[in-house]
């Protein structure tokens, strides 16, 4: 039960913020004459902001330290980026939610509160309903843009990108509702998903920088190439899983540093671009989320290896002490 509560709240703390920001970026990207589209995008923004607010209000001492320390939920730049983006876009952003989130404390291993079960279940069901609407809205927008029926300042690839992220969120919520857990997916599948997301971030950054920012454009292009090579190696199975994870982690740690420097530069007006400050912080948080996933998988693998070695040593000692003729490979222990 505690795991269900913790995983649900952690999932929404990250993804509900991401979804409300998607709606904000779409709202800001429409022409003034597209009043109906703006109203619908703003409606989704307000609905996900309300969901996010409600999740934050019940998350104190019910989520893990790992996610609070990962800088995937908020960074030191989030509030300044929200305030600057509100000034630039005219979209009202409730930064009090971010302030409350900053004050959250960990306690994910001690959340056996039966009263929270129905609360969390309602949150999951509410998120699922909102996601169905938001995904449909994004897909309709992409179709209309492809037929030149509506203009939005965001790339069509960015619309596809945020549809995939919304569908991942929906998939995770469905798993929580159906199984009260999140299934352990093939790590390669997770890496491929997020390497694709990171590659597209690099492409978006490259395309939104001012042409005068030659060095930053070159750096962004290099990251796009690195992630493309990782995806190609995965498709061709040219790399062992452990080595692939190591390369993905190393690249993403560097890319996170690049994004953080970019966020600071945009907030300080030192970088010429048309990148919204909150978009810069948004893609930084997604990189930090991916880093946590990779590091968690690495830590789990190390624990499994240690447990396996300990088990084999125990069995070998047992056989040496109690068997007349110890046999090679006699260990039948399972983790």
Which residues does each PLM region occupy?
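Surface-exposed peri-terminal alpha-helical interaction modules
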Residues: 1-335
């Amino acid at each position: 039960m505690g795991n269900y509560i913790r995983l649900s709240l952690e999932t929404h703390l990250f993804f509900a913020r991401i979804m409300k920001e998607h709606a904000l970026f779409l709202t800001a990207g429409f022409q003034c004459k597209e009043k109906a589209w703006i109203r619908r995008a703003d409606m989704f923004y307000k609905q996900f902001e309300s969901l996010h607010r409600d999740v934050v209000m019940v998350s104190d001492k019910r989520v893990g330290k790992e996610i609070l320390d990962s800088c995937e939920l908020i960074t030191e730049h989030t509030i300044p980026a929200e305030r600057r983006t509100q000034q630039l876009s005219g979209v009202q952003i409730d930064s009090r939610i971010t302030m409350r989130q900053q004050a959250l404390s960990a306690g994910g291993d001690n959340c056996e509160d039966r009263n929270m079960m129905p609360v969390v279940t309602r949150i999951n069901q509410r998120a699922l309903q909102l996601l169905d609407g938001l995904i449909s809205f994004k897909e309709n927008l992409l179709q209309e843009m492809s037929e030149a029926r509506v203009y939005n300042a965001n790339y069509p690839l960015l619309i596809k990108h945020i549809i995939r992220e919304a569908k991942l969120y929906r998939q995770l919520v469905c798993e929580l509702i159906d199984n009260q857990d999140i299934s352990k997916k093939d790590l390669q599948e997770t890496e491929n998903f997020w390497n694709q997301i990171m590659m597209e971030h690099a492409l978006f950054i490259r395309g939104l920088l001012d042409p005068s920012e030659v060095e930053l454009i070159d750096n962004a292009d290099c990251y796009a190439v690195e992630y493309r090579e990782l995806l190609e190696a995965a498709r061709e199975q040219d790399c062992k899983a452990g080595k692939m994870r190591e390369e993905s982690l190393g690249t993403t740690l560097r890319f996170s540093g690049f994004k953080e420097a970019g966020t600071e530069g945009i907030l300080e007006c030192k970088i010429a671009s048309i990148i919204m400050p909150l978009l810069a912080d948004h893609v930084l948080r997604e990189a930090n989320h991916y880093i946590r996933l990779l590091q968690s998988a690495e830590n789990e693998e190390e624990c499994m290896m240690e447990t396996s070695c300990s088990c084999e040593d125990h069995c070998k000692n047992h056989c040496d002490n109690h068997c007349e003729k110890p046999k090679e490979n006699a260990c039948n222990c399972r983790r």
